[in-house]
């Protein structure tokens, strides 16, 4: 069976895709270029994180995780370039998908530092959240950020996320337990009717 990794979502300026293992070099290039930018706000990474082999395995696992409704990781690619060659400029993940009476997932995301301030993450996450609610049938998304990460807080506010609390020593980042602001977004009565620009 040939795996063509179809585009999951398209926005005005972006494609959001579940990538195949042969995209490992492009994913690695994104992470290497943003090591100093995303590292300080990310949990510890395995020693092999910055290797093509790690990403080939991880991308194969991502496809299985989506198939079995465990998680969904998409990468952001700018429109206007062939999909097989387009650089990766960000990512978004629905992790820890929980079904049954909860119907929830944890939202995570990152953007290449060279593309910040253009509204791309808001654009991507608006489409991704709508997909989570409509196509995936989720009811609630949770997204947490470091208190000092004002850029991430602003993105979440624009999407309609509501702060729900403050968790002390919530996540181990760079060897230190860090506090996080807890936020959530509940599915609208009619998908696609959330928040403004």
Regions inferred by a protein language model and the residue ranges of each:
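Acyl-donor (CoA/ACP) binding surface of acyl/acetyltransferases
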Residues: 1-26, 30-40, 75-197
